[in-house]
Swiss-Prot record:
Region (Disordered): 1-274
Membrane topology: Peripheral membrane protein
Family: Belongs to the SNAP-25 family.
Species name: Candida albicans (strain SC5314 / ATCC MYA-2876)
Compartment annotation: Membrane
Low complexity compositional bias, start-end: 61-100, 122-141, 161-202
Keywords on record: Membrane, Protein transport, Transport, Virulence
UniProt lineage: Eukaryota, Fungi, Dikarya, Ascomycota, Saccharomycotina
Record protein name field: Protein transport protein SEC9
Main location class: membrane
């Protein structure tokens, strides 16, 4: 067994097969692959493709509808639960007494902002909630008490309580219950712990603990007479603070000017008045209508000029921002176009590899076809000679050599044609990618000076900030123009490249179909050999 295995013929390695095929003139695939020049764009395209979300089955939705009324604690925190249980939903509306909703409108809850509608002795910590309870003990200094009787304690300083008997400390609260008016003064509470000195109420019943209000009389009678100082007691008239003064000193609406001293009086040491003012001084109390019209016109013109300057600067700032945004979008479009063109270059390289592999496959298929024909001839009957006619051996050899030569030339032509197309595509894509859309620093310097000199025609009292904005606007517009030209070139290059690759893809498709047919025919011929 060992001796037989030792003398058994070994299988040839791949390298030996390649050498044997090369020795007989059969084309083989070389290990020296072409270096990729757009491999980075291929990796970028693969990363972008991997970043896309994949499709998956729908299931495990944590926000699905849950049947109400269950008493488990694993419910949807956002589902509407109408049962009597307490769930983890902080925003649901529940009618239970121990609901944890701080925003619901429950009867008795811990809502600091909700309106309590209960009639029992509940307590609400809401500092802003309007209550409908009666007999409210409140410290609201601004609240209005308008309701019936209940018993509820609240600490809201702004709440509106609706009670008849208000035990309030509000110095400004006003009651709407009116039982009459006596003598022009009133009390605003039936049994008030503190009188409101500013309320305009209408109650007539007085309390022993109330104080006289000096400003509570309604402003219906205007009179400047006052008989009891500031008191608003049993008097026939009250002081109206809103009345228009009718005193003599308020009749003159024009400013009073000091009379100038007569220039005819001799100025000597005896009649010299040191307190006298010589010349007409400017009165700061003059009305605007009495200012000279020329001065008003000058001031209005100056204001209009300043307003125009501000408008010009504002428009310039808007133009700068607009050009910046446009330049940013142009740069983004340029980056996107460059990446797209680079991915087209990587695609062109892969198309070239596919063309080379198809060409090699066609050559191998032709060789396989010849081998199948030879095998069929050798498998004939022993009575039929397999060597052929010995008298035309030289002519058959010449025909075979001519056929091999033609096949080799055709293969070389196709390979060179593919290489030329690949080189043209590579150069076209390189030119589109390496095209610089910006100019050098020297060009930008002279261009800025030229733009600044041209901008002086429509500038008004410009400063350094205006000059900088004009330079930036001109520079941004120039760069936008350069990017627009580059984008146009990228678009044309991509269009040409896509058309070229479409043509190559059609050729690859035709070659692949032809190769498939030839392989199928060789397989059928091998199966028919017996």
């Amino acid at each position: 067994m060992g001796i037989k295995k030792m003398f058994q013929k070994k299988e040839p390695t791949e390298q030996e097969i390649r050498e044997e095929l090369s020795r007989v003139g059969i084309s083989t695939r070389s290990n020296n692959t072409r270096q990729e020049k757009f491999g980075a764009f291929k990796n970028y395209a693969q990363e972008r493709a991997n970043m896309k979300p994949q499709l998956g089955p729908v299931g495990g939705n944590p926000y699905a509808n849950i049947n109400p009324g269950t008493n488990n604690n694993n419910n949807n925190p956002y589902a509407n639960d109408n049962g009597n249980n307490s769930t983890g939903n902080p925003n649901n509306n529940s009618n239970s007494n121990n609901g944890g909703n701080p925003y619901g409108g429950g009867v008795t809850n811990n809502n600091p902002y909700g309106g309590s509608g209960g009639n029992g002795r509940g307590s609400s910590p809401s500092p802003y909630a309007p209550t409908t309870s009666t007999t409210t003990r409140s410290s609201n200094p601004y609240g209005n008490n308008n309701g019936s009787r209940s018993s509820q304690n609240t600490s809201s300083p702004y709440a509106k309580s609706t009670n008849n008997s208000s035990y309030s400390n509000s110095p400004y609260s006003g009651s709407t219950v009116n039982n009459g008016n006596r003598g022009g003064h009133s009390n605003n509470s039936n049994s008030s712990a503190g009188g409101n000195p500013y309320a305009a109420g209408g109650r007539s019943s007085q309390s022993q603990n109330s104080r006289d209000n000096v400003y509570t009389a309604p402003a219906t009678r205007t009179s400047t007479r006052q008989t009891q100082g500031y008191g608003g007691g049993d008097t026939d008239s009250t002081l109206d603070l809103n009345a228009i003064p009718s005193h003599q000193m308020f009749d003159n609406k024009k400013p009073i000017k000091r009379n100038q001293q007569s220039s005819q009086q001799p100025a000597n040491d005896y009649n010299l008045d040191l307190n006298d003012e010589y010349g007409e001084e400017e009165d700061l109390n003059l009305d605007i209508s009495e200012v000279p019209e020329e001065q008003q016109q000058i001031n209005s013109e100056d204001e209009e000029v300043e307003a125009i300057k501000q408008d010009i600067k504002f428009v310039k700032q808007e133009s700068v921002q607009s050009t910046r945004n446009t330049l940013r979008m142009a740069q983004e479009a340029d980056a996107s176009g460059t990446n797209t063109l680079g991915m087209l270059g990587s695609q062109s390289e892969r198309l070239y590899n596919a063309e080379q592999n198809l060409l090699l496959a066609e050559t191998q298929t032709q060789i396989a076809d010849e081998k199948v024909k030879e095998l069929k001839r050798l498998n004939r009957s022993i009575f039929i000679p397999a060597n052929g006619n010995p008298f035309n051996k030289k002519s058959r050899l010449r025909q075979q050599e001519e056929k091999i030569k033609n096949q080799k030339l055709q293969e070389k032509y196709i390979r060179e044609n593919n290489r030329q197309e690949m080189f043209a595509s590579e150069q076209r894509i390189k030119q589109g990618i390496t095209n610089n859309s910006t100019n050098n620093d020297v060009y930008n310097k002279y261009q800025d000076e030229k733009n600044l000199s041209a901008a002086k025609r429509y500038q008004f009292e410009n400063d350094s900030e205006d000059d900088d904005m004009e330079k930036e606007i001109a520079s941004n517009l120039n760069q936008i123009d350069q990017y627009a030209k580059k984008l146009k070139g990228l678009a044309n290059t991509m269009g040409t490249e896509v058309d070229n690759q479409n043509t190559r893809l059609k050729k690859i498709e035709e070659s692949a179909d032809k190769l498939d047919i030839n392989v199928h025919m060789n397989t059928t011929r091998l199966n028919n050999i017996r």
